[in-house]
């Protein structure tokens, strides 16, 4: 017997799916950079990309982009954010740490008790782990992946509630 909560979640998912798919399909003609620049909730990261001169990395190639939401950046101490802005190499490497070789969709919320860990390489040369486990939000580097699987012309974008620091 389905619990009321599971039944409600299933119904909500069924109702929302056409809207989500339409929105995701609309992104396919855009690059990751265009999507980031048009999304107010990731404006700090858009600023970091521009300040580091990394627009091309977000416009060409095929990558997985893990974009920190503004709320995550706001939780970082102000002095650290200033370091990202003033120390060009630290800022550049931190931004590139959010670009990975993982271009597949992330399957989350399986609900079957299974889990999967995938180690991915970033353009900063680091390795981070994506974890998908049962009914929990998937994570990357320990940070929740809050929005997943926005296909863009040059890869796949995901929003994360954290910053993948070096």
Language-model region placement:
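Mature, structured domains of secreted/extracytosolic soluble proteins
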Residues: 2, 6-9, 13-166
């Amino acid at each position: 017997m389905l619990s009321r909560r599971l039944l409600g979640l299933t119904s909500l998912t069924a109702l929302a799916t056409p809207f989500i798919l339409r929105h995701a399909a609309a992104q396919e003609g855009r690059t990751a950079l265009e999507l980031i620049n048009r999304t107010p909730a990731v404006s700090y990261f858009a600023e970091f990309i521009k300040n580091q001169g990394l627009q091309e990395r977000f416009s060409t190639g095929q990558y997985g982009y893990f974009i920190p939401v503004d709320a995550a950046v706001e939780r970082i101490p102000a002095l650290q954010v200033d370091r990202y802005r003033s120390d060009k190499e630290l800022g550049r490497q931190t931004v590139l740490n959010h670009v990975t070789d993982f271009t597949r969709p992330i399957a989350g919320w399986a609900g079957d008790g299974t889990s999967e860990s995938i180690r991915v390489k970033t353009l900063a040369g680091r390795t981070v782990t994506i974890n998908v486990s049962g009914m929990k939000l998937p994570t990357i580097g320990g940070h929740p992946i809050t929005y997943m699987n926005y296909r863009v012309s040059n890869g796949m974008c995901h929003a994360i509630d954290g910053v993948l620091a070096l």
